[in-house]
UniProtKB/Swiss-Prot annotation:
Name of the protein: Photosystem I reaction center subunit VIII
Keywords: Chloroplast, Membrane, Photosynthesis, Photosystem I, Plastid, Thylakoid, Transmembrane, Transmembrane helix
Predominant place of localization: plastid
Biological function: May help in the organization of the PsaL subunit.
Localization (cell): Plastid, Chloroplast thylakoid membrane
Domain of life: Eukaryota
Ranges annotated as spanning the membrane: 10-30
Disulfide bonds: none
Amino acid sequence: MTNLNLPSIFVPLVGLVFPAIAMASLFLHVQKNKIV
């Protein structure tokens, strides 16, 4: 494994997983407080 191969996989993974977690936590927060 080269050092150049790691960011090419890690960056899109974080770029997709982090917003998904943020949206999920926000959705659960809104559902819990019923601000809709």
